[in-house]
Amino acid sequence: MKIQCAIIGSGNIGTDLMAKLQRSPVLEPAWMVGIDPDSDGLARARAAGLKTTHEGVDGLLPHIEGDGVRIAFDATSAYVHAENDRKLQEKGVMVIDLTPAAIGPFCVPPVNLKDRIGDGATNVNMVTCGGQATVPIVAAVSQVQPVDYAEIVATISSRSAGPGTRKNIDEFTRTTSRAIEQVGGAKQGKAIIILNPAEPPLIMRDTVHCLVQGKPDHKAITESIERMVAEVQRYVPGYRIKNGPTFDGQRVSTFLEVEGLGDYLPHYSGNLDIMTAAAARAAEIFAESLQSASDAPATA
């Protein structure tokens, strides 16, 4: 039986996430929560058979138990996530946070998803689009040899940056920098985001620079990065290396691009697509652990 889910936020990310959850073998999107009764996201959700409310999380709370909602995705804003999380936690709902609020531990699926399941976290943070794209590369390098400093530059199309993204720019840089260190393994991390107004819009591009201790092991680092890219491609097929890794002294540079699947968002919105795909991937693994727990025979 599929695990019932609610999506909080009916904007670009929430609507694209709904499309991905509808394909999931273990997740069932049951609710879409918004605040604008006329939003396109709520209209699409109703057409897809989901229950909807435009009264925010408060409109969902009375129905959580009756509809068996076990997992909620918060695709709203860092500024309201704390309150949403408090209300959902009181109802025993697992929260996947797609905002930069970072109340719970970071989750970058190919790097530390198993750790998050093992530590019993009830709120996990999906970092940022830049974090999901670049932290795996930093981690791949640091698995080979220590990284003293890592700097990432995420360039996204202005068209793919909605009001939520623009409002959370400062949180984006802080949260991504922390994830580079805490998940990627760099001693010091820095993140930069660039909104590119070019027309036609360009797909997401990311640059990852790592300064390693000692002379870089070219072969081992290249193989580690290639393995990590293959892991990300399992849930983001449009994730690929554009150039690199290249080596200049102790600096290792990798140039990436991320093309979206085009579920609800245009193909150039790879920055949003990698967030929804990573969140769906994480939730599927959590759902499987919930199913395993419920299927396990009771012991005296």
UniProtKB/Swiss-Prot annotation:
Keyword presence, Acyltransferase: no
Alphabetical UniProt keywords: Aromatic hydrocarbons catabolism, NAD, Oxidoreductase
Active site: 129
Record-linked SUPFAM superfamilies: Glyceraldehyde-3-phosphate dehydrogenase-like, C-terminal domain (SSF55347), NAD(P)-binding Rossmann-fold domains (SSF51735)
GO BP field: catabolic process
Reaction catalysis annotation: acetaldehyde + NAD(+) + CoA = acetyl-CoA + NADH + H(+)
Enzyme Commission no: 1.2.1.10
Entries under Gene3D superfamilies matching the protein: Dihydrodipicolinate Reductase, domain 2, NAD(P)-binding Rossmann-like Domain
Major enzyme class: oxidoreductase
Molecular-function GO terms, alphabetical: acetaldehyde dehydrogenase (acetylating) activity; NAD binding
Residues annotated as binding NAD(+): 10-13, 160-168, 271
Family membership: Belongs to the acetaldehyde dehydrogenase family.
Protein name per its UniProtKB record: Acetaldehyde dehydrogenase
